[in-house]
Swiss-Prot record:
It is found in: Cytoplasm. The keyword Electron transport does not apply. It comes from Anaeromyxobacter sp. (strain Fw109-5). This is Phosphoribosylformylglycinamidine cyclo-ligase. It catalyses: 2-formamido-N(1)-(5-O-phospho-beta-D-ribosyl)acetamidine + ATP = 5-amino-1-(5-phospho-beta-D-ribosyl)imidazole + ADP + phosphate + H(+). GO terms for cellular component: cytosol. The keyword S-adenosyl-L-methionine does not apply. It is an enzyme of class 6 (ligase). The lineage of its organism: Bacteria, Pseudomonadati, Myxococcota, Myxococcia, Myxococcales. Its main location: cytoplasm. NCBIfam families: purM. Its EC number is 6.3.3.1. Keywords: ATP-binding, Cytoplasm, Ligase, Nucleotide-binding, Purine biosynthesis. It holds the Pfam family AIRS_C.
Length: 344
């Protein structure tokens, strides 16, 4: 009796079919610098160095955590790829870099070309929103490694910034203004807690007041906002001193990452509205407010620090991008390492 790779659980033909299904999604994301499309051994990108005096490449990698479990439970796979791109390119953008290209890893126990194509459709949409090219990726079929119908994702983004325009927070000083930019919801962090608080108690098709008519599942799967073009537009308008992408660790864990020692950010909770999904998690799960702030973005997906004289121009630039933003606090003198405090 002969044994084939398919008998062992790996279907090469299904993988080839997936490649053909994703090409139409990836093709529109390609930039002029891309020299080869999906399917080669490596993605080729010819950086236009003439645009820079001293180019610096910026890289980022991330996943979407257990938000995937919500996608599995809802059997919806066409937006989770947007989250994957967002988690990577937002990190690249907040140092001032333009995202250039993106690669993904998709691992599953039994490959479904249709399911994989839905995921990549979302990845391609995320790349379109970020203005970067989807130039490659890896699909791994790992029999017995994942539960049926489940998969894992990882993303990798590369951008470029002029060395003199790197946003590193070194110029932040007491008296500077903290501007918070609205998130779309939970984004892609804290889902282990959110699932425990909500999905262990309620079905995904339940509707709660405050969710804008959406079901619980729809609210939990709301894609992460991709701020890449917003960041670049804001930098064209004002000299932003620091950016923070608010991910795991929330405001207290992320804002200090780009502040110099001897400073602290003091944010006032009353200065910005909090989307209803956060109140729902807090109420249904009995989650302490401090834990909420240590886990979730609490309505602010991006934070920028600007000089007081640039505050109005910063708000105007963000409004022009269709974003809600608020002056949420200020920088004060601190002691030792930088900190962030949310005052209620």
């Amino acid at each position: 009796m002969s044994l084939t790779y398919r008998d062992a659980g790996v279907d090469i033909d299904e993988g080839d079919r997936l490649v053909e299904l994703i090409k139409p999604h990836a093709r529109p994301t390609l930039r002029p610098e891309v020299l080869a499309g999906i399917g080669g051994f490596g993605g080729l990108f010819a950086l236009d160095v003439k645009k820079y005096r001293e180019p610096v490449l910026v890289s980022g990698t991330d996943g979407v955590g257990t938000k995937l479990k919500v996608a599995f439970a809802a059997n919806r796979h066409d937006t989770i790829g947007i989250d994957l791109v967002a988690m990577c390119v937002n990190d690249v953008a907040v140092v001032g870099a333009e995202p250039l290209f993106f690669l993904d890893y998709f691992g599953t126990g039994k490959l479904s070309a249709e399911q994989g194509a839905e995921v990549v459709k979302g990845i391609a949409e995320g790349c379109r929103q970020a203005g970067c090219a989807l130039i490659g990726g890896e699909t791994a079929e790992l029999p017995g490694f994942y539960a049926p119908g489940e998969y894992d994702l990882a993303g990798f983004a590369v951008g470029c910034v002029e060395r003199s325009r790197i946003v590193d927070g070194k110029g932040v000083a007491p008296g500077d203004v903290v501007v918070g930019v609205a998130s779309t919801g939970l984004h892609s962090n804290g889902y282990s807690l959110a699932r425990k608080a909500l999905m262990d108690r309620h079905p995904l098709d339940r509707r709660f007041d405050g969710l804008g008519g959406r079901t619980l599942g729809e609210a939990l799967l709301e894609p992460t906002r991709i701020y890449a073009k917003d960041v670049l537009a804001l930098l064209d308008a004002v000299p932003v001193k620091a950016f923070s992408h608010i991910t795991g660790g929330g405001l207290p864990g992320n804002v200090p990452r780009t502040l110099p020692d001897g400073t602290r950010a003091v944010l006032e909770e009353k200065r910005w509205p909090r989307p209803a999904i956060f109140d729902l998690v807090e109420r249904e799960g009995g989650v302490p407010r401090d834990e909420m702030y240590r886990t979730f973005n609490m309505g602010l997906g991006l934070v920028a620090v600007v000089a007081p004289g640039d505050e109005a121009a910063a708000h105007a630039a963000l409004r022009a991008r269709g974003l809600d933003a608020w002056t949420v606090g200020q920088i004060e003198v601190g002691t030792g390492e930088a900190t962030c405090e949310v005052v209620r």
